[in-house]
């Protein structure tokens, strides 16, 4: 039976195992005193979290039992440090990838009598800058943080106290969401995303399950501030074949709605279809322009696929039609060896008056502020399949056939 939440805070120290299940987690990153372990700010952070009633996991990249630095045995101390460094780095990277939030508190000190320089902190900061799960803070007097400010301040808020930094983190995590086994390695905002869940539920439905997971890349729409695309590297146990496959990436984005707007002729190859011509950066053809059916996606979770299709048809070719005229053809992946998202294809049969009006339309369509600049074309099916990619070829032929 799944637990709904943890009763108290769980602290995991350097090189200790991740918990078997959790609802939320944070990693405390930032400079550590090289010798004066008792002055580490992590102890104060745990006290603050306890007072806040935080009941999730806290990863601390320090040893549970502190061993004083021996100034009289510098060589021995350096050998010990080298021996544990690789294990420490591997543990830290794994936990930072898996956790739901990374707290960077950077009270950097560069005094001769007390060093807390934070060189490793700088590396980790840059490594996880685009993870969309950082919570950053530093005292005003902390030196050498200007560069970190410059590369992050457009995306993240900098807090001036440790308490404020932790408060923002705890508020973001909220009640969390229950995960167990390998799911613990999936950050909360990824696990909860529609893109991931659409893929993951299908795996579970056929008896597959995760044996490993690593997040590789994620893209948040700059204006909407919403997660749009994810690239992750899963290890999957395949129930049908009784084996594990772990050498592929999954590109997950929001599902899409496309519309085949057509005027029917006796010979389906002579039937006329509407195509959108637009420059898209990935294009790789002789004309360096994309020719495709009207379509797109919505970041609004309340939009259904039909509403999205209706909206896209109006935006991209200027045709506003009653939703009752849209007929759903099929729901399929567009490129199943790489991308997990699906396309739902609708078709709309146009009248002679509508198709003739579109033939005369020389205006530019699309949402200009989203950099869309769309020219519409009316082509026969035979002409269209020579212009479009394989995905659109399949959609046109299936839509016309059915």
Regions found by a protein language model. Give the residues of each.
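Conserved short-loop catalytic and cofactor-binding motifs
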Residues: 29, 80, 113-116, 247, ...
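Internal, well-ordered alpha-helical scaffold/interface segments
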Residues: 43, 90-93, 97-100, 291, ...
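Conserved catalytic or regulatory cores that recognize and/or transform ribose-phosphate-containing ligands
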Residues: 1-183
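N-terminal leader/linker segments that precede catalytic domains of diphosphate-processing enzymes
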Residues: 181-293, 297-311, 318-370, 377, ...
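Hydrophobic alpha-helical segments that mediate membrane insertion or helix-helix packing
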Residues: 28, 128, 309-313, 317
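Short glycine/proline-rich, acidic loop/turn segments that cap or connect secondary-structure elements
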Residues: 138-150, 364-378
């Amino acid at each position: 039976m799944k637990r709904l939440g943890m009763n108290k805070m769980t602290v995991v120290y350097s090189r200790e195992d991740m918990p078997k299940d959790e609802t939320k987690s944070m990693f405390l990153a930032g400079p550590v005193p090289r010798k004066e372990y008792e002055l580490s700010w992590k102890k104060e952070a745990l006290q603050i979290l306890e007072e806040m009633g935080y009941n999730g996991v806290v990863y601390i990249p320090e040893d549970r039992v502190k061993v004083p630095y021996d100034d009289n045995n510098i060589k021995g101390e350096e050998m010990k440090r080298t021996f544990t460094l690789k294990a420490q780095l591997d543990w830290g990277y794994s936990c930072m990838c898996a956790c739901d939030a990374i707290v960077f508190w950077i009270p950097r000190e560069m005094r001769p009598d007390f060093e807390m320089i934070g060189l490793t902190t700088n590396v980790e900061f840059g490594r996880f800058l685009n993870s969309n799960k950082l919570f950053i803070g530093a005292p005003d007097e902390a030196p050498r943080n200007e560069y970190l400010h410059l590369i992050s301040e457009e995306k993240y808020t900098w807090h001036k106290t440790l308490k404020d930094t932790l408060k923002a983190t705890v508020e973001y995590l909220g009640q969390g969401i229950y995960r167990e086994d390998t799911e613990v390695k999936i950050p909360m905002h990824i696990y909860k995303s529609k893109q991931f869940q659409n893929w993951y539920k299908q795996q579970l439905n056929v008896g597959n399950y995760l044996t490993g997971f690593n997040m590789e890349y994620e893209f948040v729409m700059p204006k909407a501030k919403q997660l749009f695309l994810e690239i992750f590297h899963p290890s999957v146990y395949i129930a049908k074949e009784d084996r594990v496959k772990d050498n592929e990436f999954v590109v997950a984005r929001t599902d899409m709605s496309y519309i085949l707007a057509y005027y029917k002729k006796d010979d389906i190859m002579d039937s006329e279809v509407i195509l959108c011509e637009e420059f898209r950066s990935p294009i790789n053809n002789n004309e360096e322009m994309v020719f495709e059916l009207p379509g797109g996606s919505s970041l609004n979770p309340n939009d259904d696929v039909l509403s999205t299709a209706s909206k896209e048809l109006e935006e991209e070719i200027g045709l506003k039609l009653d939703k009752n005229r849209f007929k759903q053809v099929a729901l399929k992946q567009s490129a199943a060896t790489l991308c997990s998202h699906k396309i739902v294809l609708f078709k709309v049969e146009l009248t002679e008056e509508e198709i003739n009006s579109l033939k005369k339309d020389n205006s530019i369509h699309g949402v200009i502020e989203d950099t869309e600049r769309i020219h519409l074309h009316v082509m026969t099916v035979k002409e269209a399949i020579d212009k479009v990619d394989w995905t659109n070829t399949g959609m046109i032929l299936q839509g016309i056939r059915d």
